[in-house]
């Protein structure tokens, strides 16, 4: 029998086949996820309507399909069709109402929410996960993963252009942004499908819809005419963040993009002006530059990446300038205008003077803010932070309402995916009576510029502000053999020691493999490892990790392969 695509959500006329979860010969049962289907409304699972054996798969990942197309051929029994129209992408028959009483309700399926749900289920809690959009939240769909996919494509393209350094030359290199975006989407789809698989395997019920509080322990979830009233002993709010809005005249002009739009832009501009020199802005600045785009960055603060140490900020500034990226700090954007030729004109004030930059596109990258939209928190006793900047929580992630927790970007502690995930685990442990607290002193942070930047623990400025007596050791990647073979000699490893306590309290890395190396520094600080123990540890050669060993030696006798 032929299994066809019988409907699509919304007004979509066609879709793309995402991750295929089955193989010829597989036996599937009712509601098993066969494919992921991607429409312009997002990603949805295509589930089996009965128990049957897969005889032939007629489509491939990435193939465009439309209603009526045969997706696969199977043998077995299909559940009889209902008289009412059924949406095979997760929607139930319209008008359904259901009352539920459970142990744990998680609102939001980002890296905080879905980890909380899986961890809670593994710990024996009857768990429901609610999500109004795609599984994976901002990080997986329009944040961490898509950005890093583009960063890698840009890096590969730039290396091919500069192959002469490595002894080869490629002529007529052509960049196809449609394929770059398609690769990004495929990676995302695979990961979304993986989350859906894990939820099914852990018997977690996923309800797609928008959640709003009725009272302190009752939540209404609506999608279309379907309504679910859920009463939960414990609720974890994990609704993440949304792009911050800024009042700049002209911000709604058609050539102005936000980060979400930039991640799906299949037409590469010749030039772009980026408003914001923070993490998002600088990651996009380097990836666009590696794609050959002329980039300018306008930053309000007196330096880019103001959250990292000054020497790290200055190092990445020098590298950016060497790549032709224009940087304008201490600059306030006053308006955006459209030129006669349709280009964007960004007007800003700098040192009392009005200046302007002209570019094909403008990217606004000024950060994100907690997303509490539609939750109807006014129906509860939940307290918010000052100026309503997120949900107020204690170190155990509890709100002021017993049984309600808030994790991730929505509590506005630290906007990092790995922080959200760990907060979720701590919350579930506390639900189970373990009385745990979230520790923020040793949270690694990574910025995917070129080269990468990573830091953990206290910064030099924080130590100075706290009057901590410190010693600093730096080891440059220019003295590291592996970095030289990679053609990446810029940057350094920096380690900070508290002389009074006799332990390492912070560190920064700017250079090759920083995103991976930071885990070693995190472990060193978290476990209070002494210099002696680190010095006695054998680091593999040739690796960039040897730089950590050298930097630690620099705190005492001095590095072996570098002499200041």
Residue ranges of each PLM-predicted region?
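Flexible, glycine-rich terminal cap/loop adjacent to redox cofactors
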Residues: 107-112, 116, 121-133, 138, ...
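Glycine-rich flavin
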Residues: 66, 88-102, 118-125, 130-268, ...
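A Rossmann-like FAD-binding core segment of flavoenzymes
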Residues: 171, 205-208, 212-225, 230, ...
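Glycine-rich dinucleotide-binding loop and its adjacent helix/turn
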Residues: 85-91, 144, 239-294, 298, ...
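Acidic, low-complexity mobile loops and tails
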Residues: 1-36, 45, 83-89, 99
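Short hydrophobic core segments
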Residues: 105-107, 211, 229-240, 274-275, ...
């Amino acid at each position: 029998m032929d299994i066809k695509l019988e409907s699509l959500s919304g007004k979509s006329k066609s879709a793309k086949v995402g991750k295929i979860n089955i193989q010829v010969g597989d036996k599937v049962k009712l509601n098993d996820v066969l494919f992921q289907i991607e429409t312009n409304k997002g990603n949805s699972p295509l589930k089996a309507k009965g128990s049957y054996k897969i005889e032939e798969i007629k489509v491939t990942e990435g193939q465009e399909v439309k209603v009526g197309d045969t997706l696969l051929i199977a043998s077995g029994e299909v559940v009889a069709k209902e008289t009412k129209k059924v949406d095979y992408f997760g929607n139930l028959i319209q008008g359904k109402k259901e009352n539920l009483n459970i142990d744990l309700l998680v609102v939001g399926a980002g890296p905080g929410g879905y980890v909380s749900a899986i961890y809670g289920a593994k710990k024996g809690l009857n768990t429901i996960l609610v999500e109004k959009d795609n599984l994976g939240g901002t990080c997986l769909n329009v944040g961490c993963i898509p950005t890093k996919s583009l960063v890698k494509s840009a890096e590969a393209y730039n290396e091919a252009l500069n192959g002469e350094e490595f002894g080869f030359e490629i002529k007529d290199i052509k960049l196809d942004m449609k394929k770059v975006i398609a690769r990004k989407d495929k990676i995302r789809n695979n990961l979304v499908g993986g989350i859906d698989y894990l939820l099914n395997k852990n018997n977690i019920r996923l309800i797609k819809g928008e959640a709003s509080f009725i009272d302190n322990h009752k939540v209404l979830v609506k999608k279309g005419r379907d309504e679910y009233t859920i009463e939960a002993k414990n609720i974890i709010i994990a609704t993440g963040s949304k792009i911050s809005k800024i009042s700049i005249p002209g911000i709604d002009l058609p050539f102005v993009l936000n980060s979400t739009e930039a991640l799906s832009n299949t037409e590469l501009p010749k030039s772009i002006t980026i408003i914001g020199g923070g993490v998002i802005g600088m990651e996009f600045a380097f990836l666009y530059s590696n794609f050959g785009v002329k980039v300018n960055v306008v930053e309000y603060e007196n330096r880019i990446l103001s959250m990292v140490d000054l020497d790290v900020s200055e190092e990445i500034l020098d590298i950016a300038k060497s790549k032709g990226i224009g940087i304008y700090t201490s600059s306030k954007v006053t308006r955006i205008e459209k030129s006669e030729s349709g280009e964007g004109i960004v007007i800003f004030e700098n040192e009392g003077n009005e200046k302007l930059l002209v570019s094909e596109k403008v990217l606004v990258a000024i950060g994100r803010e907690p997303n509490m939209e539609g939750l109807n928190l006014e129906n509860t006793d939940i307290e918010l932070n000052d100026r309503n900047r997120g949900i107020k929580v204690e170190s155990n992630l509890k709100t002021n309402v017993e049984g309600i927790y808030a994790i991730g970007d929505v509590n506005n502690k630290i906007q990092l995916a790995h922080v959200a995930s760990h907060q979720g685990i701590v919350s579930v442990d506390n639900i189970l009576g373990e009385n745990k607290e979230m520790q923020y002193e040793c949270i690694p942070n990574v910025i995917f510029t070129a080269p990468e930047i990573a830091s953990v623990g206290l910064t030099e400025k924080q130590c100075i502000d706290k009057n901590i007596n410190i010693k600093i050791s730096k080891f440059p990647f220019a003295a590291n053999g592996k970095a030289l073979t990679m053609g990446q000699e810029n940057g350094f490893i920096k380690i900070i020691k508290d002389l009074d306590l006799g332990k390492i309290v912070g560190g920064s890395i700017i250079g090759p493999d920083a995103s991976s190396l930071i885990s070693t520094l995190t472990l060193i600080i978290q476990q209070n490892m002494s210099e002696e123990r680190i010095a006695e540890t054998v680091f593999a050669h040739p690796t960039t990790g040897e730089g950590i060993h050298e930097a630690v030696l620099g705190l005492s006798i001095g590095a072996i392969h570098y002499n200041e």
